[in-house]
A protein has these predicted regions:
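Aliphatic-rich helix starts adjacent to a transmembrane/signal segment
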Residues: 27-48
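N-terminal alpha-helical signal peptides/signal-anchor transmembrane segments
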Residues: 43-59
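Low-complexity, S/T/G/P-rich flexible repeat/linker segments used as non-globular hinges
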Residues: 105-127
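N-terminal single-pass transmembrane signal-anchor helix
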Residues: 2-28
């Protein structure tokens, strides 16, 4: 008539839990990081598409081999993005920056630049 667990049984359970946590924790952490990366990429695509719509609807022009930017704040103000702000899932901070618009090979190309300092290198589309 035993009434409890022996020390060896308790240690065995602790070892099993430790082994499982060593296996499970990195897997869960990697899954979370991957989900954040995927969400970030989706946010970037949404911003680029909104920048493209803003550019097209505003009838702005970019000449061959010219580069101009439209700021995320301008896109938000003109309601091409439905949220009042877009949050970066990696940093939990608001996504700012701009969409860089290039015209070459007879086609427009759009790229999201996350830092305002990178945007200042280019002319604003409104100028």
């Amino acid at each position: 008539m035993r009434r409890g667990f022996t020390l060896i049984e308790l240690l065995a359970v602790l070892v099993i839990i430790a082994i499982l946590s060593v296996i499970v924790v990195p897997t869960v952490t990697n899954s979370i990081e991957e989900a954040k990366e995927n969400t970030y990429n989706e946010q970037v695509n949404i911003i680029k598409q909104a920048g493209e719509s803003y550019f097209i609807d505003s009838n702005y022009k970019v000449l061959e081999n010219e580069q101009k930017v439209v700021y995320v704040t301008d896109i938000l103000e003109s309601e091409y993005l439905s949220n009042s702000q877009i949050i970066n899932p990696k940093t939990e901070k608001e996504m700012t920056g701009c969409v860089l618009i290039n015209y070459y090979s007879e086609q427009y190309h759009y790229k999201y630049l996350p830092e305002d300092k990178d945007c200042k290198k280019y002319t604003n589309i409104k100028e």
